[in-house]
Design a protein with these regions (language model features):
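Flexible, small-/acidic-enriched active-site or ligand-binding loops
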Residues: 225
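Active/ligand-binding-proximal structured segments within catalytic/core domains
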Residues: 10, 17-68, 179, 250-262, ...
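Charge-rich, well-structured scaffold segments of protease-associated domains
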Residues: 2-6, 17, 54, 61-219, ...
Length: 418
């Protein structure tokens, strides 16, 4: 059973009891990410996430590591474009200590100047890793072109220039205005009792500043076009995509079914026609990225540089086919079954259930039950898939980016026509 409530401080708590397991995963989710940064402070949200593990006013970094190791637990965090998450998985008997550790991290970071300088170097190396990983880099270049005039287009890590300019004082100021009760969701799933956890949370977070949630940013608009980044590597990497619906859109499940048919499974059209039938690529797939007010559907392929134009032409053909013709009944059935199975299999652990609870609270403000989701997927028709494809796959908002050698034929905007 899922229980959700807002505590007097403004902090939101949502739990799901899973009596058949012995573990508990609890996460502290911050409803602020890289899209809420200014241009000058790009990367600050991710930098702060790193620093929370470098010591608090009551624990050193070593003591943090020793505490979680002594529990036999797992502690981790990540920063996304619309939120950040700090989470721990432990046996149920260790929940009080784990929650105390989490609250210490998100309420009392030290931001010691020496640690800030050292971690700054670590993050700059992390940025270089992306630059040296072309399959990651092409997605970054794609997002930067796709939403070139909006914070969603900026890299979560920031740029070398913005990260190098951030100081301990700037990190403290960002932390003070952002890490406040109304921005937090505490989500937990596993062998737990909601009332007992509520008492633990209230005690652990009783000094969390009330504050006020920050202002939202305006929805983004797409900048269509083609961007090529030359790299001396063995193959070319391609991203091609269009806008998609936001997270809570009424047609989101029809969009998920459409994406499954397009390129999100082994039997998908892109995988079969580009890899299996023609051997043009090892990796080829489509994926959806959805936010509170925007989204994008992206096709990725890694192929021989001289084959890029052929892969693009085949991809555009598949987009056109989805837009102009209804999918056959057997293909629709297979896509819906795949989507439902993936959903259920992906929510068997306490960690995945905790993340699901938190995202539901952040994007919907309520818990959408499994039965609701399964029924919504099952209700998708071939007409729905075609209607959504016709709505999303438009020539006036196509974006393509490539990362690869200079030897290949250059893509042009004129060649991007569905």
């Amino acid at each position: 059973m899922v229980v959700a409530e807002t505590l007097p401080s403004g902090l939101r708590l949502v739990t799901e009891q899973m009596p058949h397991v012995r573990s508990v995963t609890v996460g502290v989710w911050l409803a602020r990410g890289s899209r809420h940064e200014s241009d000058a402070e790009s990367g600050v949200a991710h930098f702060v996430e790193h620093m929370l593990f470098k010591g608090t006013t009551t624990r050193s970094a070593r003591e943090i590591a020793q505490t979680i190791d002594s529990l036999g637990g797992q502690l981790d965090a990540f920063t996304a474009k619309e939120y950040a998450s700090y989470y721990v998985k432990v046996l149920d008997e260790h929940l009080p200590v784990a929650l105390s550790l989490l609250s210490d991290l998100v309420m009392r970071p030290a931001f010691a100047p020496d640690d800030v300088a050292r971690e700054q170097s670590v993050i700059l190396e992390e940025i270089k890793m992306v630059e040296d990983a072309p399959d990651d880099l092409v997605h970054e270049v794609f997002a930067q072109q796709f939403w070139s005039r909006h914070p969603l287009g900026r890299p979560i890590l920031g740029t070398p220039e913005t990260v190098a300019a951030l100081t301990a004082d700037e990190l403290r100021r960002y932390f003070a205005r952002t890490y406040v009760a109304p921005n937090f969701v505490v989500a937990a799933a596993g062998h737990l009792d909601h009332a007992q956890l509520r008492d633990l949370v209230q005690r652990a977070f009783e000094t969390l500043p009330a504050g006020a949630p920050g202002a939202s940013t305006a929805p983004p608009s797409v900048t269509p076009g083609v961007v090529t980044r030359y790299k001396d590597i063995e193959q070319s990497h391609l991203c091609l995509g269009t806008p998609a619906y936001p997270q809570a859109h009424a047609d989101r499940h029809a969009m998920y079914v459409m994406n499954t048919i397009l390129g999100a499974s082994m039997s998908s059209r892109l995988f079969q026609h580009i890899r299996e039938d023609r051997g043009l690529a090892y990796a080829v797939f489509s994926h959806l990225t959805t936010y509170s007010d925007a989204g994008m559907v992206t096709v990725y392929a890694g192929c021989a540089t001289e084959k890029v134009s052929q892969v693009v032409a085949l991809t555009l053909r598949e987009l056109r086919e989805l837009r102009e013709a209804e999918v056959p009944a057997d293909e629709l059935r297979r896509a819906k079954d795949h989507l439902k199975g993936s959903l259920m299999l992906g929510l068997e652990s306490t960690s995945s259930r905790m993340s699901h609870l938190a995202r539901q609270e952040l994007f919907f403000g309520r818990h959408v039950t499994f039965d609701e989701m399964l029924a919504s997927i099952e209700a998708v028709s071939a007409v729905d898939v075609q209607r959504v494809a016709a709505d999303l796959f438009r020539d006036d908002c196509l974006v393509a980016t490539t990362v690869g050698p200079e030897s290949g034929p250059a893509l042009t905007a004129d060649g991007l026509r569905i």
